[in-house]
Amino acid sequence: MGRAPIGGFARRAATAYEHRGCARIVARGNVGRVADSFYRQDPADPNRYLSTELTRGPWSPDAQHAGPPSALLGHVIERCEPRPGFQVGRVAVEILGPVPLAPLTAQAKVVRSGRSVELIEATLSSERGPVMQANAWRLKLAEPALELPTEFLPTGSRPLPTATEPEQFPSDQEIGFHTGIEYRFIAGSFAVSGPAVCWIRLKYPIVAGTTPSPLERTLAAADSGNGVSAVLDWSKYLFINTDLTVTLHRQPVGEWVCLDAVTHPQPHGIGLAESALFDETGPIGRSTQTLLIAPRG
């Protein structure tokens, strides 16, 4: 769910306001504008994205949840020299520091090209410098499809999101990432500590004027693994992820992504959150987050 400086958690009131279910955009020169997306592409610079208050995270009113910028990295990765018949199989995101609610520059390039696999590097920067970076493996799809033993193919499912009601993330922020997505718990709850099974759906596109891709939806959802399976009191502890790794053996179908998530804390202050990922038809992959655990101060 992103990084924030230890001891830097601010509890000042958010400056957001609601207007027809949307949030104000927070970019110099755009104050008062309302948003129906997490980012807007700058018309003057296609690599520059204006952040809206829907990106705000739980640790500070001035920092983004890592889900939207991770999805933004996925957005530019998929648009970097796209190749028919290839698919992203893994994305590893490094969170270099708090991502400010400010304009961001996103760039991607192929650093290793090949006939069957290629490596893409993407960077997200604010005016202060790089804040996130990602490496993605793009793999060639088998054509025709391989004839594999059916007993070894991934199977299993989770009850569908229609089996439960939406649950609101507990936050003192009026508008943020928690108002831009929908959570539906099959097991666990924000009010109950421990493992959880939770369906997540984006209410808005990552970038205005575009439809969220399966990769964008997965990256945005997967960064909530440590949040839905929290084992510590939010008011007493920080458990902030320094990274997010998502491996997909197939693309999700539909708008919902399910996390079967568990958090493993250690007394020395390092933890791991891991999630089995599903869509409405079955397994799609896994995600992990390395956690920095510390008392609030």
Give the ranges of each region predicted by the language model:
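Terminal targeting signals and extreme-terminal segments of soluble enzymes
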Residues: 25-297
